[in-house]
Amino acid sequence: MSLLDKKISTWFMRQAGRYLPEYLKISKEMTFFQMCESPEIASEITLQPIKRFDLDAAIVFSDILVLPRALGCNIDIKKSTGPVIERINNPNWLTYDAFEEKISPTLNTIAITRKSLPQNKSLIGFAGGPWTVALYIIEGGWDKTFLRTKEFINKRYHEFKEIISILTDATIQYLNKQLKHGADFIQIFESFAWAASSNEFKEFIVEPTRRIVSSIDVPVIGFPKGAGVSYLQYVKETSVDVISTDHSLPLDWIADNLQTHAVVQGNLDPYLLAFNKKEALLQTERIVDAFSEKNFIFNLGHGIYKETPLSSVEAVLDFIRARN
């Protein structure tokens, strides 16, 4: 059964992660990339939320920074500070020399997971959107202003465009390899969509995403986080099959403007799930009421937080199953 076949399908962004005690037990002994690069371990982590919550889809345990790492970027993820990235200053620094070797663990994780995952569960592969990955590697991490990238775009436009082109081509290769190894859905995480001007959004988010979607033969979920009203342009011009919505968008606006173009995914505020179970349940009911005229995928407006109580996740799932 596909995610698209149920009245309400459910999975959570970052569902395999630090809110799960079984994940913490493994992560105490290994770094993040050690876990990602150990296919048996990564597959075990991928399956943990399925075994605990019986969700409708697993998403491979990996990271959007696996791709730029495979293109030669020096990247690490620290438990205390997050991504530590050696900034790139030239598109020529991106190389395919170790590409196959570096993506191999994720592909093997997908293959192992598909064999263990029940056939009625979907397996989601993913990548970061080229814009988001470019911002990470030019900035050397996350920055609330992205001044370095904006300077790069305005002073070295053609080189930035080349970086986006390289990342787009690599993403297409990477995602198609994920499909060959057993993924049956793809999500594109455009986490920094909010940082793009309207012109940048069109050229560096919409156009690359359209190219990626047209090159993939399974349903694609697009997530242009923080894009606001530009969500409509994104869903109309990229041809994504599913539009994943963040929790800043009004439910009636989503239903009126987006649900006519694609299956809606979202959009419970992960802060509510972490800190206010009562309100999380009320908002879950509002979401179900808003979107239930058509099939939709219940998810969060962003990744689940490590502080999230398991009881809150279980309560939300119980409510949704009662309405399915």
Curated annotation (Swiss-Prot):
The record marks D63 as: Transition state stabilizer. Substrate binds at R14, Q15, A16, G17, R18, F32, D63, Y136, S191, H302. GO terms for biological process: protoporphyrinogen IX biosynthetic process. It is found in: Cytoplasm. It catalyses: uroporphyrinogen III + 4 H(+) = coproporphyrinogen III + 4 CO2. One of its GO terms (cellular component) is cytosol. The keyword Secreted does not apply. Keywords: Cytoplasm, Decarboxylase, Lyase, Porphyrin biosynthesis. Its EC number is 4.1.1.37. InterPro entries: UROD/MetE-like_sf, Uroporphyrinogen_deCO2ase_HemE, Uroporphyrinogen_deCOase. Pathway: Porphyrin-containing compound metabolism; protoporphyrin-IX biosynthesis; coproporphyrinogen-III from 5-aminolevulinate: step 4/4. GO terms for molecular function: uroporphyrinogen decarboxylase activity. Homodimer. Catalyzes the decarboxylation of four acetate groups of uroporphyrinogen-III to yield coproporphyrinogen-III. Belongs to the uroporphyrinogen decarboxylase family. NCBIfam families: hemE (TIGR01464). This is Uroporphyrinogen decarboxylase. It comes from Neorickettsia sennetsu (strain ATCC VR-367 / Miyayama) (Ehrlichia sennetsu). The lineage of its organism: Bacteria, Pseudomonadati, Pseudomonadota, Alphaproteobacteria, Rickettsiales.
